[in-house]
């Protein structure tokens, strides 16, 4: 194997290994695209690794991207999940959930998904 090929292989391996340590969302309730018949009491997020609670938050937005509230996430009995308790019931409409956490390597991880509440 040539030196260039070895360096390329090592670089590709490093990129793959770095990506393995990044946290990502596995599941959420309400889930992406879900239509609910009533307001949820909380937003619950599950990750592939334990989220860093001090760096985890959920921002709830209206469909037009106007902010409703940012909620500090709290730990749950499942170490891979966090909950964001809603301060009051949501009226019918379309919503966006912006979540943020950190991987154990310190990288900030973010995501957005939407859900609806039917009238």
Residues covered by each model-derived region:
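Short, exposed beta-strand-loop hairpins at the edges of beta-sheets
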Residues: 87, 98-112
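Extended, polar beta-sheet/loop recognition surfaces of beta-rich domains
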Residues: 36-38, 42-49, 106-119
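Proline/serine/threonine-rich low-complexity linkers at boundaries of modular beta-sandwich domains
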Residues: 16-27
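A glycine-anchored, Pro-Gly-centered beta-turn/N-cap motif
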Residues: 39, 86, 91-94, 100
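Bacterial N-terminal signal peptides
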Residues: 8-18
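Solvent-exposed serine/threonine-rich low-complexity stretches and specific carbohydrate-binding patches
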Residues: 68-77
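Aromatic sugar-binding surface patches on proteins
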Residues: 77-84
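Short, surface-exposed alpha-helix to beta-strand junction/turn motifs within ectodomains of secreted
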Residues: 43-45, 49-68
